[in-house]
């Protein structure tokens, strides 16, 4: 039986969740930036009006948190750091040259992707906690003013860090040819998988061989 040239990397439900986060994050990031930079208040028009921006910003933030927690449960087992990540980190120059397949035996996600995963998850947790504390008119009145002020600063810092992390994530997605297509269509070529994630590709081949054996092909 001939093998398909394409293999599934990301299931539909995970892709749908990912792009939902992308859309919501775009809206929340723009409105959040406008709150701290008055000259950019026009960015709140992404929600229609400045008033609607302030009202909807936290609700969309909650939506992002829920979606990311779903993704956390789905992907955390693939993002546990281990000693096999060390060669990737030690040879980062070669990785940036596109030679990661020569220096590291990468699984489904490389060390950089794992760091991105934990950065995003930790920042969204900080944003949730501080966001609830500063959320008027629902929760802010239950906290001392000093706590609200510090939470506002921490919320802003976490937001800036997360925005930068997402920008790096976007850049890397464009830099590694085939990544975006894989997240849109859910499939990548065997050649792509073998080059960028050889250990994961071997696991796929092993699973395919086992399935064929069980089916008596």
Swiss-Prot record:
Pfam families in the cross-refs: Ni_hydr_CYTB
GO cellular component: formate dehydrogenase complex; membrane; plasma membrane
Induction context: By nitrate under anaerobic conditions.
Annotated positions binding heme b 1: 18, 169
Subcellular location: Cell inner membrane
Residues in compartment: Cytoplasmic: 1-11, 75-110, 176-217
Keywords: Cell inner membrane, Cell membrane, Electron transport, Heme, Iron, Membrane, Metal-binding, Transmembrane, Transmembrane helix, Transport
Cofactors named for this entry: heme
All ranges on the Periplasmic side of the membrane: 37-52, 135-150
Topology of the protein relative to the lipid bilayer: Multi-pass membrane protein
A GO BP entry: anaerobic respiration
NCBIfam families: formate-DH-gamm, PRK10179.1
Subunit structure: Trimer of heterotrimers, consisting of subunits alpha, beta and gamma.
Known role: Formate dehydrogenase allows E.coli to use formate as major electron donor during anaerobic respiration, when nitrate is used as electron acceptor. Subunit gamma is the cytochrome b556 component of the formate dehydrogenase-N, and also contains a menaquinone reduction site that receives electrons from the beta subunit (FdnH), through its hemes. Formate dehydrogenase-N is part of a system that generates proton motive force, together with the dissimilatory nitrate reductase (Nar).
Protein name: Formate dehydrogenase, nitrate-inducible, cytochrome b556(Fdn) subunit
Species the sequence originates in: Escherichia coli (strain K12)
